[in-house]
């Protein structure tokens, strides 16, 4: 892997650190490399959870590398099969990703965090989508994912004026799961990752699949859909060894041993 990405495997947890001084900005080359990492994570049966963070204490990521843009990299450049930052367009990832936001998450950096399943941020973190002030739009998920969380008036202000949102406000709006000190950030993210590892992998995959396929459906239609047999993971959960192991472990007062089948 390149000098821009540092990978650490802790059992079934993969930690990815973006390290591109000074602002952890992402060009097309780095985006391709991040895509390879996330696709390998998706396909590795030994890995259960990924944590993505930035090096240093100031920037999670400033988003698209404007130096690369100034040198000719186009806004519609090929950023790889996972989309910008390697994650924003992987729509079949059935393992959870935690964004440990250690500082500013601007533009594509904010969009990378929004593509994760959980956001844990340091109390000095700040979020913004300033693309309109640069003559472009946040089309790597920001303008699509943020309206699913925030009211339209707040979204409009963020995407049209580029206003920043601090960590505590992001927590109040439900953008982030937790706000902790900078010193506690990675330990807190690892604690959350371990909690996810303690849950059955097939159940996690089924939950992500259900969210992904039914989020825009009326509840009654969604019920019919998930019980129609078209989903991959939900029927597997119902007839899995893990579905037997969970209640058995509870009855025997021990931790379950998940097999993922």
UniProtKB/Swiss-Prot annotation:
Annotated active site: 111 (nucleophile), 131 (proton acceptor)
Family: Belongs to the enoyl-CoA hydratase/isomerase family.
Name of the encoding gene: caiD
Domain of life from the UniProt record: Bacteria
Catalyzed chemical reaction(s): (R)-carnitinyl-CoA = crotonobetainyl-CoA + H2O
HAMAP family per record: CaiD
Function: Catalyzes the reversible dehydration of L-carnitinyl-CoA to crotonobetainyl-CoA.
Pathway where this protein functions: Amine and polyamine metabolism; carnitine metabolism
EC number: 4.2.1.149
Keyword rRNA processing: no
One annotated GO biological process: carnitine metabolic process
PANTHER family, alphabetized: ENOYL-COA HYDRATASE, MITOCHONDRIAL, ENOYL-COA HYDRATASE-RELATED
Gene Ontology molecular function, alphabetical: hydro-lyase activity; L-carnitine CoA-transferase activity
Protein name listed in UniProt: Carnitinyl-CoA dehydratase
Keyword Manganese on entry: no
Pfam families in the record: ECH_1
InterPro entries in UniProt: Carnitinyl_CoA_dehydratase, ClpP/crotonase-like_dom_sf, Enoyl-CoA_hyd/isom_CS, Enoyl-CoA_hydra/iso, Enoyl-CoA_hydra_C
Matches recorded under NCBIfam families: PRK03580.1
Keywords: Lyase
């Amino acid at each position: 892997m390149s000098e821009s990405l540092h990978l650490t495997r802790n059992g079934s947890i993969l930690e990815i650190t973006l390290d591109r001084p000074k602002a952890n900005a992402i060009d097309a080359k780095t985006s391709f490399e991040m895509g390879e990492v996330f696709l390998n994570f998706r396909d590795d049966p030994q890995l259960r959870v990924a944590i993505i963070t930035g090096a240093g204490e100031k920037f999670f990521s400033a988003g698209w590398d404007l130096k690369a843009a100034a040198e000719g990299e186009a806004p519609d450049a090929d950023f790889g099969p996972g989309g910008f930052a390697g994650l924003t367009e992987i729509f079949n990832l059935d393992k959870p990703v935690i964004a440990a936001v250690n500082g500013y998450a601007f533009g594509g950096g904010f969009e990378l965090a929004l593509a994760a399943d959980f956001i844990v941020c340091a109390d000095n973190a700040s979020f913004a989508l300033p693309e309109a002030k640069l003559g472009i739009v946040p089309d790597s998920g920001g303008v699509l994912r943020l309206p699913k969380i925030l009211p339209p008036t707040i979204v409009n202000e963020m995407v049209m004026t580029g206003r920043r949102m601090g960590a505590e406000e992001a927590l109040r709006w439900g953008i982030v799961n937790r706000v902790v000190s900078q010193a506690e950030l990675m330990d807190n993210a690892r604690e959350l990752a371990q909690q996810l590892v303690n849950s059955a992998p097939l159940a996690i995959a089924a939950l992500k699949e259900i969210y992904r396929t039914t989020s825009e459906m009326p509840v009654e239609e969604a019920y019919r859909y998930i019980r129609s047999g078209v989903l991959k993971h939900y029927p597997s959960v119902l007839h899995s060894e893990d579905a037997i192991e969970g209640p058995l472990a509870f009855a025997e007062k021990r931790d379950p041993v998940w097999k993922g089948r």
